[in-house]
Amino acid sequence: MKYAVIGNPIDHSLSPVMHNANFAALNDLSSYEAINIRNEDFHRIKEIINDKALSGFNVTIPHKERIIPYLDEIDEQSKTVGAVNTVKIVDGKWIGYNTDGIGYVTGLRQVYPDLEDAYILILGAGGASKGLANELKKFVRPKLTVANRSMDRFESWQLEVNKISLQEAEAALSEFDIIINTTPAGMNQNKEVIINLDNLDSHTLVSDIVYVPFKTPILEIAEAKGNPIHNGLDMFVYQGAESYRIWTGELPQIQIMKDTVLKYL
């Protein structure tokens, strides 16, 4: 079987080394590659994928929403989030899934197993935030709180959450057990910290969905204050593991996937 990840740009993606390491560990002859598809070429997506004879593929930035009109079906998570990151091809039928939420929450539960009574603040109200919130609601009793710079961003939200501004979040920071950054702040060379952590309680876990850099500025500040931190590596690995399960019905070698990615960070 052949699989791939599509995006633009895609050269930086660690998905091929992660998935190919898993295939090798399972003595599976399948392969996984990265395919760069420019926005202006996306109308040829069916032709490009069919020419590669893929059995499934992952979708990353900026195509997670753009792919939806080309799919025959999408799962409930994808409908809620409005984005797809995994496609399974069965007898020519394209079925879309979103594994970001389950990937993140599975990783979070490794470091914070007692989620049930946690008060959680999510920073950002984009697609990633929606996916995480939708999955977290299955495990957490207190209503989730989502903070964003612009309140207009909440207009597309169907989920029942507390919606507050970043200023309100800063004032109430000490009330939360877990704070999750889902914004691009801190990615690559971006040194922005989206929220002031002065009011952070010492017990609060600070998490970021980014894994490059390994410690974003918000995580560095939290760690310097003595708080536990959690980056996006687990989310990346577990969403990939869930993609593999969707494609094959089998369980992957998760530790090998994680160890392989760590070698490149």
Swiss-Prot record:
<feature type="binding site">
    <location>
        <begin position="124"/>
        <end position="128"/>
    </location>
    <ligand>
        <name>NADP(+)</name>
    </ligand>
</feature>
<keyword id="KW-0560">Oxidoreductase</keyword>
<dbReference type="InterPro" id="IPR041121">
    <property type="entry name" value="SDH_C"/>
</dbReference>
<feature type="active site" description="Proton acceptor">
    <location>
        <position position="64"/>
    </location>
</feature>
<dbReference type="Pfam" id="PF08501">
    <property type="entry name" value="Shikimate_dh_N"/>
</dbReference>
<feature type="binding site">
    <location>
        <position position="85"/>
    </location>
    <ligand>
        <name>shikimate</name>
    </ligand>
</feature>
<dbReference type="GO" id="GO:0050661">
    <property type="term" value="F:NADP binding"/>
</dbReference>
<dbReference type="GO" id="GO:0009073">
    <property type="term" value="P:aromatic amino acid family biosynthetic process"/>
</dbReference>
<dbReference type="InterPro" id="IPR046346">
    <property type="entry name" value="Aminoacid_DH-like_N_sf"/>
</dbReference>
<dbReference type="InterPro" id="IPR013708">
    <property type="entry name" value="Shikimate_DH-bd_N"/>
</dbReference>
<comment type="similarity">
    <text>Belongs to the shikimate dehydrogenase family.</text>
</comment>
<feature type="binding site">
    <location>
        <begin position="13"/>
        <end position="15"/>
    </location>
    <ligand>
        <name>shikimate</name>
    </ligand>
</feature>
<dbReference type="GO" id="GO:0005829">
    <property type="term" value="C:cytosol"/>
</dbReference>
<feature type="binding site">
    <location>
        <position position="209"/>
    </location>
    <ligand>
        <name>NADP(+)</name>
    </ligand>
</feature>
<dbReference type="GO" id="GO:0008652">
    <property type="term" value="P:amino acid biosynthetic process"/>
</dbReference>
<dbReference type="Pfam" id="PF18317">
    <property type="entry name" value="SDH_C"/>
</dbReference>
<feature type="binding site">
    <location>
        <position position="60"/>
    </location>
    <ligand>
        <name>shikimate</name>
    </ligand>
</feature>
<dbReference type="InterPro" id="IPR036291">
    <property type="entry name" value="NAD(P)-bd_dom_sf"/>
</dbReference>
<protein>
    <recommendedName>
        <fullName>Shikimate dehydrogenase (NADP(+))</fullName>
        <ecNumber>1.1.1.25</ecNumber>
    </recommendedName>
</protein>
<dbReference type="Pfam" id="PF01488">
    <property type="entry name" value="Shikimate_DH"/>
</dbReference>
<feature type="binding site">
    <location>
        <position position="232"/>
    </location>
    <ligand>
        <name>NADP(+)</name>
    </ligand>
</feature>
<comment type="function">
    <text>Involved in the biosynthesis of the chorismate, which leads to the biosynthesis of aromatic amino acids. Catalyzes the reversible NADPH linked reduction of 3-dehydroshikimate (DHSA) to yield shikimate (SA).</text>
</comment>
<comment type="pathway">
    <text>Metabolic intermediate biosynthesis; chorismate biosynthesis; chorismate from D-erythrose 4-phosphate and phosphoenolpyruvate: step 4/7.</text>
</comment>
<feature type="binding site">
    <location>
        <position position="211"/>
    </location>
    <ligand>
        <name>shikimate</name>
    </ligand>
</feature>
<dbReference type="GO" id="GO:0009423">
    <property type="term" value="P:chorismate biosynthetic process"/>
</dbReference>
<dbReference type="InterPro" id="IPR011342">
    <property type="entry name" value="Shikimate_DH"/>
</dbReference>
<keyword id="KW-0521">NADP</keyword>
<feature type="binding site">
    <location>
        <position position="76"/>
    </location>
    <ligand>
        <name>NADP(+)</name>
    </ligand>
</feature>
<feature type="binding site">
    <location>
        <position position="100"/>
    </location>
    <ligand>
        <name>shikimate</name>
    </ligand>
</feature>
<dbReference type="GO" id="GO:0019632">
    <property type="term" value="P:shikimate metabolic process"/>
</dbReference>
<dbReference type="InterPro" id="IPR022893">
    <property type="entry name" value="Shikimate_DH_fam"/>
</dbReference>
<keyword id="KW-0028">Amino-acid biosynthesis</keyword>
<comment type="subunit">
    <text>Homodimer.</text>
</comment>
<keyword id="KW-0057">Aromatic amino acid biosynthesis</keyword>
<dbReference type="InterPro" id="IPR006151">
    <property type="entry name" value="Shikm_DH/Glu-tRNA_Rdtase"/>
</dbReference>
<dbReference type="GO" id="GO:0004764">
    <property type="term" value="F:shikimate 3-dehydrogenase (NADP+) activity"/>
</dbReference>
